[in-house]
Amino acid sequence: MSTDWQAWHAAYADPDSDLSRRRRSVQRQIAQWLDDRNDDRLRVVSACAGDGRDLLEVLAARPDRARVTATLLELDEGLARAAAEFAAAHDLVVDLRRGDAGTTDSYAGAVPADLVQMCGVFGNVTDDDLRATIAALPQLCTPGATVIWTRGRFATGDLTGEIRAWFGGEGFEEVTFDAPWARSTGSAPTGWSRPHVRWHRARRSSASSVSPACGRSRW
């Protein structure tokens, strides 16, 4: 049975829900990233963007939003429509694409990007596909780009260690880490899916090769 993603997003209406905590965590990191970058132009891509509020709400509140070129990829028609309506209501110019974020064609003209959001992707694919996605991420990134991703903590196992190692193997440096569930509950109850948020920065040459790097840790 396929997931009703619009019903899944209903949890965001509760400010104390795990999803709402995760969104606030992601939004803090997006805002900090924008503060840290003084570029005149920045390119952002959000895969499986849902209603796009994690990014769009941040942009709507910023006077420097015009320097951001944002592309949102979302397959669900209702969620894509909600993102478009929010963007229009707040005079945000974004490229909203109804398409499969798992195909390279969907990113045509939008990458390489300075910020790549993989929020909600890693908990909804197989482990093999997750590994392959991380391996492909350098192709979506400019030199020094940032990747923000989220992953739930599941009763069947926590892939945090493996995911961090996979990122490191592709030349990414972990910048910061946030676990909203830990702040709110102190621990993750067995059987519950609790969100982790990671922020990795890509360090690579202008060529296609990927090289590891050292840097600050913020997440």
Across the structure, where does each feature detected by a protein language model lie?
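Class I SAM-dependent methyltransferase Rossmann-like catalytic core
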Residues: M1-D39
